[in-house]
Amino acid sequence: MDFKIDFSKAFTVNQYLLTLLIAVGFLKLIASPKKEKNHLLPKGKQSFIKTYLSVHLFGSVINISSLLLVADKMYKKSPLNPAQIVLLTRAFASDAYWSPFFVAFAAAITYAPNLQTYTIISFGIFLAITAFMITYFDVTKDKKFNIDEFNGYPLSLETLYLPIILAILVLSTHYFFPNLKVIVLISTFSILMTLFILPLKKNFSEALKILKYHILNELPKMKSEISLFLVAGLFGILIGSVLTGLNFSLPFEVFDYKVASLLLLIFILLAFIGIHPIITIAMIGDFFVNANHTLLAMTFLMAWSTTVSTSPISGLNLTIVARYNCSAKEIFMLNIFYALKMYIVCVICLFVLSKYLNI
């Protein structure tokens, strides 16, 4: 047995992930949504669809800020009802399937750096659309959701052109300069766009004040998330070193859709007992260096999205429980069958992706 711990890697393995987490935070300074101008907000199915899209599309860029913005407005009127809880958890969590601005994508690209970005996003968007269709079917067919009386809070989508421009910049630059890491491009363009557009939307002195406030007040509030990812990297490398020293090897030769499906199930079960997906990813990442990185990354993203919406101890659900006086058990019961359906969809998707990649 030969135990060697790479302490340098332990503290730096998640540095790109942290860079993205901090850089994308600047986007909310220029891409924050506005309330729809229509004072008579629609009720029922139309309201559900518009609100779902609002949380999902803005959540893909400005992260949990979009969910809190909508949920705060809902909670002011009355306690969150089952339909609203389902919308908030699923609309936000399904961003993890595809959004390159989401921290889940950063985790995937950290441990599977050779992934095919376009393939991941394409399959991820399909999963996000499927998640919406399953959710919409659930709330319209089950009378307990009382969808005809649903009160939503749609947001104006006019500022969404900014992340679209950002995505075009990132993907086109990566196409011409494939050696540049996507995660570095997203981080760089996020800050550059903020520095360029904020003074155009406000005046220069106001933009300076907003930037100063964000750097001095908002960034320090991210200490919990940053600590989680630093500890995950450290813990993952230490566990990996121990397993390597014990001559641990994976019980399979080819990482195909069958192994990926089993790995996805393990991720989900571990998340339900409190082990964050980033911890599991960090622990096993080094053992999959020879696997197909696109299939591996897709498995990571599927695990992240499916568990975030359902696990009673995910960061998202703990926030909803604490902030809006909801029941963790209720959230779990509302989403557990959704998670099961999405797992089946994910397995089918892994099979198709595996065939597409000729594995």
Question: Could you say what each language-model-derived stretch is?
Answer:
Residues 54-62, 88-98, 272, 303-309:
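Helix-loop-helix module between adjacent transmembrane segments
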Residues 69-82, 106-117, 256-314, 322-324:
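Membrane-interfacial helix-loop connectors
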Residues 8-21, 53, 118-131, 178-193, ...:
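Alpha-helical transmembrane segments
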Residues 1-15, 135-240, 358-359:
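Hydrophobic transmembrane alpha-helices of multi-pass small-molecule transporters
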Residues 350-359:
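Juxtamembrane boundary at the C-terminal end of a transmembrane helix
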Residues 2-74, 208-288:
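Membrane-embedded alpha-helical segments and adjacent helix-loop junctions characteristic
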Residues 18-28, 75-77, 127-137, 189-200, ...:
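Alpha-helical transmembrane segments and their membrane-interface exit regions
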Residues 78-163, 172, 318-349:
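Membrane-core helix-loop-helix motifs of multi-pass transport proteins
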